[in-house]
């Protein structure tokens, strides 16, 4: 249920600060968002997959913590990221 290498490379290119950036907050949030969106489609067909649902909730929690950190430290980057990803906040 993980993302393909090509999908990860595209996210790194879109959200990274430089070509080797794979750990910035924006990249981490973008990767988590892609994984969350992928799992949401999985749960439409596998309603009773509670084990994977727990993993989804962990990802949502991690994304929420990372976005809160980004909002606290650099509000301009936070706003740009939220608009680019289309998140609700």
Swiss-Prot record:
Transmembrane segments: none
Entries under PROSITE patterns matching the protein: RIBOSOMAL_S15
Biological process per Gene Ontology, one example term: translation
Pfam families cross-referenced by the UniProt entry: Ribosomal_S15 (PF00312)
Record-level Gene Ontology MF annotations: rRNA binding; structural constituent of ribosome
InterPro entries: Ribosomal_uS15, Ribosomal_uS15_bac-type, uS15_NS1_RNA-bd_sf
Cellular component GO terms held in the UniProt record: cytosolic small ribosomal subunit
Keywords for the protein's UniProt record, in alphabetical order: Ribonucleoprotein, Ribosomal protein, RNA-binding, rRNA-binding
Function: One of the primary rRNA binding proteins, it binds directly to 16S rRNA where it helps nucleate assembly of the platform of the 30S subunit by binding and bridging several RNA helices of the 16S rRNA. Forms an intersubunit bridge (bridge B4) with the 23S rRNA of the 50S subunit in the ribosome.
Stated family: Belongs to the universal ribosomal protein uS15 family.
Assembly and interaction partners: Part of the 30S ribosomal subunit. Forms a bridge to the 50S subunit in the 70S ribosome, contacting the 23S rRNA.
Protein name in UniProt: Small ribosomal subunit protein uS15
Species whose genome carries this gene: Shewanella denitrificans (strain OS217 / ATCC BAA-1090 / DSM 15013)
């Amino acid at each position: 249920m993980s993302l393909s290498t090509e999908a990860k490379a595209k996210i790194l290119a879109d959200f990274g600060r430089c070509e080797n950036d794979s750990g910035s907050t924006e990249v981490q949030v973008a990767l988590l968002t892609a994984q969350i969106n992928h799992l949401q489609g999985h749960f439409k067909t596998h309603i009773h997959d509670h084990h994977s649902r727990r993993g989804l909730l962990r990802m949502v929690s991690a994304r929420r913590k990372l976005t809160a950190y980004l909002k606290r430290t650099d509000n301009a980057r936070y706003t740009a990221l939220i608009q680019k990803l289309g998140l609700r906040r």
